[in-house]
Design a protein with these regions (language model features):
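Short, conserved active-site loop motifs that form the nucleotide-linked donor/cofactor pocket
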Residues: 9-12, 85
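Long, charged, helix-prone linker segments
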Residues: 143-154
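Core RecA-like ATPase module of SF1/SF2 helicases and allied nucleic-acid translocases
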Residues: 1-4, 16-122, 127-135, 157
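Short beta-alpha junction loops
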Residues: 138-142
Length: 157
């Protein structure tokens, strides 16, 4: 179901590890930037801190301007005119929207010892931050990743 959004069919792709997932997202973001989408219109939304650290390290090494919004206050008070990719948790992303959103590590969901229904709602929050393009990646197999692959294949057909 579309959740009332319009835009490109979401992308979901399997990669061998989290680092390669982030590298794929960087490739996608560079392509969107080359097509005229500003860095400030892109966000990477993650579930747990180690993912955010991997994202930040790789974006910095790639020379992409980036701002890590590590808390709820920061996610509400950032400079939206600063031309940088915004990186934040799924929780912090609530209420925000970006033309381009990437979510790495979908295969980690549902996160250990957390209610799968709550994790599904949290993933939904992250996914619906995307107004035009949604890129998701996974390397670990999970019920969430498989359901997303199936749903996107159905929509794209």
């Amino acid at each position: 179901e579309s959740a009332g959004r319009h835009g490109a069919v979401p992308l979901i792709t399997h990669r061998p590890n989290l680092g390669v997932e982030v590298d794929y997202i960087i490739e996608c973001f560079r392509q969107y930037h080359d097509e005229g989408i500003a860095w400030r219109e892109m966000a990477i939304i993650y579930r747990v801190k180690f993912m955010g650290e991997e994202v930040m390290n790789r974006l910095r090494r790639a020379g992409i301007p980036v701002e890590w919004l590590q808390g709820s206050w920061e996610s509400r008070h950032f400079d939206s005119s600063a031309d940088s990719v915004k990186v934040m948790t799924m929780h912090s992303s609530k209420g925000l929207e970006f033309p381009v959103v990437a979510i790495p590590g979908v295969g980690y969901l549902p996160w250990k010892d957390f209610d799968p229904a709550e994790e599904a709602r949290l993933l939904y929050v992250g996914m619906t931050r995307a107004m035009e393009h949604l890129v998701m990646t996974y390397h670990a197999e999970s019920s969430f990743a498989q359901k997303l692959v199936t749903a996107i294949e159905r929509v794209a057909a």
